[in-house]
A protein has these predicted regions:
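Amphipathic alpha-helical interaction segments
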Residues: 101, 115, 143, 220-221
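Broad, structure-driven detector of short, well-ordered beta-strand segments within folded domains
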Residues: 154-158, 194-199
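Glycine-rich portal/gate segments that line the openings of hydrophobic small-molecule binding cavities
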Residues: 112-187
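Terminal "cap-and-tail" regions of soluble proteins that handle hydrophobic small molecules
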Residues: 1-70, 184-188, 198-267
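Extracellular structured ligand-interaction cores
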Residues: 75-79, 194-196, 205
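Hydrophobic ligand-binding cavity/cleft-lining segments
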Residues: 14, 26, 33-128
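Amphipathic hydrophobic-ligand
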Residues: 189-193
């Protein structure tokens, strides 16, 4: 088990510090089997050009899995049932966790170090709908997805900026969503990715459908492949991010109802 950094006295005094001490929620056996089973057939992957298929009813050919696609980009999908979680809680979490380091660390105490909101005034603007307090903001993140702590910039976008049909967000098709283009601290260096977290409300909670397209970026308002033709994203990077996603969202599903109940007004 990775060693957790000790909390400072100031952090230990925070009302949500107790969540840092919880054991990580085990990844379900069926998901571990997918991880161990190796990559899916790339033909099952959702092409980034077809991303609005997420709004279609039912499931897509791959809801849980990872691969390197034929064009060299990486793809991963995860489906997480989050019992007792509402779309409002999910939107709140993305705004709330970016304001203090420990809030991000309780999400995955072994692999998360900080997520720092660069647009605090917008995130704290109570006149905005909760999801819009994250849309259009930037998080500076330090996390470990398998290769040691790695700095990352996450630019959260309004869905229409990422080519999604934003008019369907907040409907039966999609209760809410978070999407971002991520890259290293120096744009153009390292591996970039397009991230989407798509939420459906179901009986007893929500279903979170996550998609990552690794090797893509947002350039001049268009989602483009940044990996040169003939070059592929290393499979171990895709597999590592898939494993991390299974872990972090499984744990968030376990803690979010209580974190929200106790801290929803604690900005």
């Amino acid at each position: 088990m990775p060693e957790r950094a000790p909390l400072t006295a100031e952090e230990r005094a925070l009302p949500y510090a107790k969540f840092y001490d919880l054991p990580i929620t085990p990844i379900p056996e069926d998901k571990l089997a997918v991880l161990a089973g190796g990559p899916i057939d790339p033909a099952l992957a959702l092409k980034i050009e077809d991303r609005n298929d997420l709004f279609l009813p039912g499931d897509l050919p791959c809801e849980i899995g990872y691969c390197v696609m034929e064009n060299g980009a990486g793809f991963l999908a995860n489906r997480t049932f989050m019992p007792g979680v509402t779309p409002e809680m999910f939107d709140w979490w993305f705004a709330w966790h970016s304001l203090e380091d420990l809030r991000y660390r309780i999400w995955d105490p072994e692999d998360h170090f900080y997520a720092r909101q660069q647009n605090r005034e917008k995130t704290l603007d109570q006149s905005l709908p909760m999801r819009e307090r994250t849309w259009g903001t930037q998080h500076v993140v330090l996390e470990d997805i398998g290769g040691g702590p790695d700095p990352l910039i996450l630019n959260f976008r309004y869905p229409h900026e990422m080519g999604y049909d934003e008019s369907k967000v907040g409907t039966e098709a999609c209760a809410t969503m978070m999407c971002a283009n991520g890259h290293g601290p120096v744009p153009g260096e390292g591996v970039a990715a397009i991230m989407t977290h798509f939420v459906r409300e179901v009986e007893g909670g929500i279903v979170l459908r996550s998609r990552f397209w690794i090797g893509y970026g947002l350039v001049d308002g268009q989602l483009v492949k940044l990996v040169p033709d003939g070059v592929s994203v290393p499979l171990e990077i895709v597999q590592g991010l898939f494993a991390h996603n299974l872990k972090e969202f499984g744990h968030l599903a376990a803690i979010l109802p209580q974190v929200y109940a106790e801290n929803k007004d604690n900005w």
